[in-house]
Amino acid sequence: SSDLFGALAAVRDAEDDAVLAAVRAERERQAAAQLTLPAIAGKLDVYKILRFVRSEAFRRICGAEDVLRELAFITSLPAAEVIAAQGRALPDGPAADAGVLVQGIADIVLVYPDHLELLDYKTDRRKTPADFVRAYRAQLELYAKAIEKRFAPRRVTYKGIYSLELGELIEV
């Protein structure tokens, strides 16, 4: 939630114990306010959150002019762009110009005065950064195109995946 981001931003430069205490306090606050189910709150790995606070992804979030979370979009893109983003061969003829509906929810769009950045969280247990790039490159390419269309003339200049399992930001 945005309250968690605020709590983390307030202590991001603090010692690890202070960050962990803030995460635990926010977890308890959300459970008490019934914003999070107690069973889910109990499974929150505070050490993975600490690793996130120390990450490049969190530095980028804190440095943005605006942070758009769970940005839903639906747009039409030329079939040629959709096929190219998937790494497939482009068709010839009118099919390449046909519109394809692209719909999704971007985890985080970072807004800067002259550009945008796209961050996606992944919880799956892939082994290497290359595994994540292979699995999600097409998704992030299409999301970036859709977001650029919505926020023109600003361009998406960075696409990244934050792997909770690996604890790192992976550029796509």
Predicted regions and their residues:
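Structural signature of nuclease core domains in nucleic-acid processing machines
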Residues: 2-172
